[in-house]
Amino acid sequence: MIVIGDFNSNTIWDKLHRGHSHSQLVEKLGSFRLVSAYHTLRGEIQGQEITPTLFMYRNLAKSYHIDYAFVSPAISRSCELLIGEPSEWLHKSDHMPLILTLSI
């Protein structure tokens, strides 16, 4: 199973969104045995992402990680996830594409 898209959330905003926080979303998806491909592959912690997926108003100084690919653990061990480079994509959108390649 794969759930991918713009979730408009990150654990950095959990306190602002009590009752429907990002951590609760990750927990709920975990109950369906789904994990973040990005965090699994890169070994990063939710809320401490190095690579942003959004540049608010296309401003490089206002970057956040709010787009995710949640996948089953089996898929997470055999996939590749790339996030588009701002130099290539920022003129098209404030969100960078998530490119999930599956090994079948």
PLM regions and their residue ranges:
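Short loop segments at secondary-structure junctions
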Residues: P73-S76, L102-I104
